[in-house]
Amino acid sequence: DGERWTASVAIEEGTSLYGTGEVAGPLKRNGRVVETWNTDAYGYQDDTASLYTSHPWVLAVRHDGTAFGVLADTTYRCEIDLRDGIVFRAVGPEQPVIVIDGDSPQDVCRKLGELTGTITMPPKWAIGYHQCRYSYDPADRVREIAQEFRDRDIPADVIWMDIDYMDGYRCFTFDSEDFPSPSQLNADLKDLGFHNVWMIDPGIKLEKGYSVFDSGTARDVWVKKANRTTTFEGEVWPGVCVFPDYTNAGVREWWAGLYADFMAHGISGVWNDMNEPAVFNTPTKTMPEDNWHRADEALGGPGDHARFHNVYGMLMVKASREGVMAANPEKRPFVLSRANYIGGHRYAATWTGDNSSNWYHVDVSIPMTLNLGLSGQPFTGPDIGGFAGNGDGEMFARWMGYGALLPFARGHTAKGNIDKEPWAFGEEVEATCRRALERRYRLIPYLYTLFRESSLNGMPIARPTFFADPTDMALRSEDDSFLLGPNLLVVAQLQPARDRVSVMPRPVEGVAWRELDFPSFDGGRDSKDPDQARLYVRPGSVIPTGPVMEYVDEDPLDPLTLIVWLDHEGKARGELYEDEGDGWGYREGVFRRSVYTAERDAGVVRVRRVAREGKMDDEGRGVSVRVLLPDGREATGFGRDGEEILIPIP
């Protein structure tokens, strides 16, 4: 009727529904109702209808393992009702509904990537571990945290600066007492092998004499009230604020330009928060829907906030990303955003927002990450340890035990809470965290290869366990475990004081998934830690791994360690992607893609590099091989990259 519309898609019996973006609750979405309306949802629970990002998208997997996806191409408020089939109910003028059919859920994910775009390769440091809190303050406290990681030999790559570094919460400023020299702080962090990320919000303090407010006012960049002439004012952290109208290209260009001086302080990455946009002391937690945006014709021309609310955050991070790239054109940008819209993964990673330190959020972090990945956002993860509240050591250990293996791994907590660094809960929990993070860093070669795959075809990095066999109905509701790429299964230990029994993928041609562990820093094996997630390797896989490092580019990948688990034919295959870790050389062919195979031949396993692509020089590095055996033992060998390596099998 011009004001609202409905679209329905019938589904066959036995069809499982997923996606719908950032949603709390189980992985399988059948019977659920959610609403796409970006919301500041602090401490959200299972029945919270709207969170921080909007993805009007449903992935449907039929009983036979074939799949289709449905995208309601609307930016307006939209209800997704999955109680009886797939129903979209949206306000605003009728918009297209796009259906993607595929032979498998993987096929549909790739086609969604073709439609909405894929991530750009992030800087390699962004795939390391991130440490954050609201807030590390003053600057010397930041230095203490960084030094503590190094003194305790716990791997980490990034320290984050929350809002308290600013002068009175004024964006693009620094507190002259607590952060007198951000350039020196960032240089000190760099000396310890750390990168840094600093927060920027959209709410700009209404204050004459504040340069950002003055320059924005001179250019008339602010969102207007319904009368289309008066600037909208709303309260956020600095007090009364005005808000840039990112729907306008000129405003985005102005915003991007603000990053030039900001990034010149040696800033590595940017965190855009509160960009739903959040507004305090209002029942809706945001600005009025009749506020007016002066959007470009490319976005359909001017319109009300009801139309642009769900893309406000995405357009902000698009502008932020452009500013970061202009300031550091030789580096890959890293931007994290709380609010986003489907397709916004091209501009920013995301996290699952202001979760809580309780066992519900330990459980729900896995399906939330997976459904975001199934909705086109692969670079995501939760606040490990929980943002709101404190929790206890066992909770933190079990959260880190699997959270360290999610695509985005960041510990974070709120102001006033107890400390939640890996060492904050005592020696036993610290040991679990160190094992978990050492495991992540051993797997960086494999993870980086998965990020490259995602950048090429849109596949999620963390994938639901049913991707191992979409025809296995027993896996359709399994959300205590997840796949990293196609070849590693992560089984989390979630419930307090006991092991969780998860549904495992069926053997492949009679060969079961094989448990994998690594040496622990204390001389044992990491799998003996009851809080550690369990790892399993798909039959027929070669997993590239590396040595433990304090940060991802501390040393060259030498030796490369290949972990082999043969299939029923005695064969295995795997890939490794490498590049410079930053910059754009890989787009000009400066990378190395290697394909490794293993094959049992009488009493030996032959390991070869059978393909090599790219201009990156061969290093002639050492290659260590671990062949996993059915009886729980291993056979090992060593050689040089590019040479055949023979491993005798006992």
State what each model feature region is:
Residues 59-64, 225-228, 506-507:
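Short acidic-glycine loop/turn motifs at beta-strand connectors
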Residues 321-335, 339-351, 364-368, 372-382, ...:
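Catalytic core of carbohydrate-active enzymes
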